């Protein structure tokens, strides 16, 4: 195979079929249509996104789910394209890549995730993947709330029962119908990602928002209950520090240090 750099390869059409397994975890490519022409800047970004050198406790799949979740939270279409192209090149299923972006919606908001999804679909189209992908929805209008409460309770236990009992009447539409029905019913129930993977994705998404330490702490604890470790959470932050920046990364690390379950 021609010895392209990762940056060159991921700017080509059909990137996912050109990159071999030997390139797994290599650096992200700059958008070929970028207005930035700064090789030094690109070289630093390449170094910081070389996933084989980052996140030692995580699988390559987990690393890409973390990166996709952070991209979804930040809301930049070009970053969505690059994160998706890299994940495709490392063998992640198109549906799982899309799912990681979908999953961020109740946390980052659907305006941001829609923008990132546009970039994801650009990468998939370039790789010859037919869209739309197969539906992963498993709930209906009639059962989404019930199914959402079930998975929410599976993760958080009796906290959910107590919350439902103590939520004031004027907030029940928001805290039960929307939180349980939309966030958990519409998204957590979907096929493709495990609950542990979804909680890791949620942690990364909230960390990228910044200033949401109460929610970040709750989901850090949920990660531990689902079988993820503190090392997994710190390593996910290390994978994505190049896009998180240090202030949000260090704040998230402090949350992990304090969390128990």
Named regions from a protein language model:
Residues 62-71, 97-101, 197-207, 216, ...:
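Short, structured motif recognition centered on aromatic/hydrophobic residues
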Residues 2-4, 9-62, 78-85, 89, ...:
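Acidic, glycine/proline-rich low-complexity segments that act as flexible tails and inter-domain linkers
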Residues 70-77, 108-109, 205-212, 245:
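Short alpha-helix boundary/capping elements
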Residues 99, 108-111:
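Substrate/cofactor-recognition hotspot
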Residues 53, 74-78, 92, 210, ...:
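Residues in soluble alpha-helical coiled-coils and helical-bundle/repeat scaffolds
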Residues 88-100, 222-235, 240:
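Short, mixed-charge aromatic SLiMs
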Residues 194-203, 207-231:
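Glycine/small-residue-rich hydrophobic helix-like segments
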């Amino acid at each position: 195979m021609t010895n392209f750099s990762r940056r060159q390869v991921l700017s080509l059409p059909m990137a996912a079929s050109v990159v071999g397994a030997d390139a797994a975890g290599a650096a992200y490519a700059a958008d070929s249509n970028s207005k930035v022409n700064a090789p030094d800047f690109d070289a630093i970004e390449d170094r910081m996104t070389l996933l084989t050198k980052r996140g030692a406790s995580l699988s390559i799949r987990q690393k890409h789910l973390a990166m996709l979740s952070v991209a979804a939270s930040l809301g930049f279409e070009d970053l969505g394209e690059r994160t998706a192209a890299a994940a495709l090149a490392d063998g992640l299923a198109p549906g799982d890549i899309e799912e990681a972006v979908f999953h961020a919606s109740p946390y980052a908001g659907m305006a941001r995730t829609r923008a990132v999804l546009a970039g994801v679909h650009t990468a998939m189209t370039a790789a010859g993947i037919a869209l739309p992908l197969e539906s992963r929805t498993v709930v209906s209008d009639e059962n989404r709330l019930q199914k959402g409460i079930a998975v929410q309770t599976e993760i958080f236990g009796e906290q959910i029962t107590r919350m439902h009992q103590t939520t004031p009447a004027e907030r029940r539409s928001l805290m039960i119908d929307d939180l349980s029905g939309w966030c958990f019913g519409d998204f957590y129930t979907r096929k493709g990602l495990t609950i542990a993977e979804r909680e890791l994705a949620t942690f990364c998404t909230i960390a990228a928002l910044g200033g949401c330490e109460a929610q970040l702490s709750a989901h850090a604890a949920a990660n531990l209950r689902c079988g993820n470790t503190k090392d997994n959470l710190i390593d996910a932050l290390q994978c994505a520090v190049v896009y998180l920046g240090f202030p949000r990364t260090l704040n998230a690390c402090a949350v992990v240090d304090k969390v128990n379950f």
